[in-house]
Swiss-Prot record:
GO terms for molecular function: flavin adenine dinucleotide binding. GO terms for cellular component: cytoplasm. GO terms for biological process: tRNA methylation; tRNA wobble uridine modification. NAD-binding protein involved in the addition of a carboxymethylaminomethyl (cmnm) group at the wobble position (U34) of certain tRNAs, forming tRNA-cmnm(5)s(2)U34. NAD(+) binds at residues 290-304. InterPro entries: FAD/NAD-bd_sf, GIDA_C_N, MnmG, MnmG-rel, MnmG-rel_CS, MnmG_C, MnmG_C_subdom, MnmG_C_subdom_sf. Its cofactor is FAD. It is found in: Cytoplasm. This is tRNA uridine 5-carboxymethylaminomethyl modification enzyme MnmG. The lineage of its organism: Bacteria, Bacillati, Cyanobacteriota, Cyanophyceae, Synechococcales. SUPFAM superfamilies: FAD/NAD(P)-binding domain. Keywords: Cytoplasm, FAD, Flavoprotein, NAD, tRNA processing. FAD binds at residues 17-22.
Amino acid sequence: MQDHQATNESFDIIVIGGGHAGCEAAITTAKLGFSTALFTINLDRIAWQPCNPAVGGPAKSQLVHEVDALGGIIGKLADETAIQKRILNASRGPAVWALRAQTDKREYSKRMIEILQNTDNLSLKEAMITELDIAKSEQVGLNSKKVVKKRIKGVKTFFGSYYSAKSVIITAGTFLEGKIWIGNKSMSAGRSGEQAAQGLTQNLHEIGIKTERLKTGTPARVDKKSIIFDELDTQPSTAAGKYFSFDPDIKNNMPQVSCHITRTTSKTHQLIRDNLHLTPIYGGFIDSKGPRYCPSIEDKIVKFADKKSHQIFLEPEGINTPEIYVQGFSTGLPENIQLELLRTLPGLSKCKMLRPAYAVEYEYIPATQLQTSLETKEIEYLFSAGQINGTTGYEEAAAQGLVAGVNATRKLNKKDPIIFTRESSYIGTMINDLITKDLKEPYRVLTSRSEYRLTLRGDNADRRLTPLGYQIGLIDEKRWSAYEEKMKLLEEEKLRLNNTRLKNTDEISKKIELDTGSKIKGSTTLKELLKRPNFHYLDLIKYNLAKKNLGYSIQEGVEIDIKYEGYLKRQKNNIEQINRQSCKSLPQEINYEKIDTLSLEARENLNKIKPKNFGDASKIPGVSKADLTALLVWLKIREINKEKTNIFCQKKLSS
């Protein structure tokens, strides 16, 4: 980029992309007092939900709770625009409980635009960014070698406008060189109806950032009026009173609707088998990897050939639209065959397809090129967040957007970044996975990915992260006061339950014994009662032993804390033990190739990722416990040798 380029405007921070990551990043930086510009190709499609019109689900809901606990937006908007809510995994333990909301996608986007337009320090710009302006400077590094430092200076648009910035956050989603496929036909697009971002990928390569290619897909939409609902199972809203947000002022005034369930048939499966060669993947037109945990219907038929039927959900896209999202039925088959397939499903034999399913392949930045702060290793003050980092899902994107936004502001303020660890949050689990693992398929957060899932529940996200959100400056005084009041009530109730004792001769004790079939020997506290597997806080209410007017979230928190007290203490001890070892730092100048005591795979992977500490090193594929022990010994020898050298130099200087 030429130095004489005239500057249109200057900002502290520029965000490239108006999806869920971009919106969280821009709102975060603007709220923290930094002049911010959000650039997007289409201002009418801000925070769009191009795939399923839903927020939450297993592990994803935990992410949404965490973003909200820190002061983010996605949870509030999901609550306000929800047209159906359900608790998933309700019959299992609290570690895997998950809230899922069906949202009105147009209302969600509309409200996000309103928030952006009314946020101080934030400007919205419709433009395609094609080039990043990088400043280079030579500095003296280790061993007196000259090192070229690169720093972001600004951005250039397709039509030649230049905007300077102290920091840039890329949140381009699936738009970098995006291409959508239906059968063997393709066109350049970031998603259906929207042009792909051209030029920026090549520019990233020129400045030293590698990109690779991934694939995802979305199902067809059908006309609600053409569905025979009598042939379907109904799935009503069952958790309208549950919220992602911990903000007590959040309300939902949307009508609640039902989703419906159908299933694939033998005709569906045969039609897919007969036409596999016409799909982009099985036909060999593309070879990009798609999401493992959201496979196309053809993948399901091929990989699970023994299954006679697959469940399909029909989900409304909003209150004022006839469009129904056919969840679990994404495909890359030609349009005419898609309609044939849909009509093999019960309830859809006369359906009209409003939008065809399609596959989309796009460029992404392998996140091993990022630091834990989401700043790129190659270029200072350049951050990357969202689907461009190889993730899939609005929730994963929103969480990364908030992290990148926070750390971009801290970098400009010369403060250390906020590092989210695996032990503290699902956000930390996700980021650690992204930057330490060589992922070859879109990444989805899962409860099974966390070693600490009982500690990292959705219900306690505020207890884990709201103090940090307040410290950062994203939680206002009103919200902080509500949090402090909740903590006070929670601790008071746990103390009351511990101190309130029932004798087995009390009338209420006899009633409890009769109802539960469990004896009270001598006496017991309410806390001990609550520890029983089949006794819950609702039972305390039933027997008039509960504190009156205590909110549901406090009742739930108290019960989980008490019922799982032993497990939680054990997990806390494990975390503290790991932290003592994992915090030991690893100098960035180490050349692991020269450490002979490490395995070859460990040397290669450690050199590639350059972990900051033992905790990060322990999570790198191919690095065994034996490698970590060898590395620890090597560091001790290195420190001893350094001390000897220093003593020798001091003696030489004094002689």
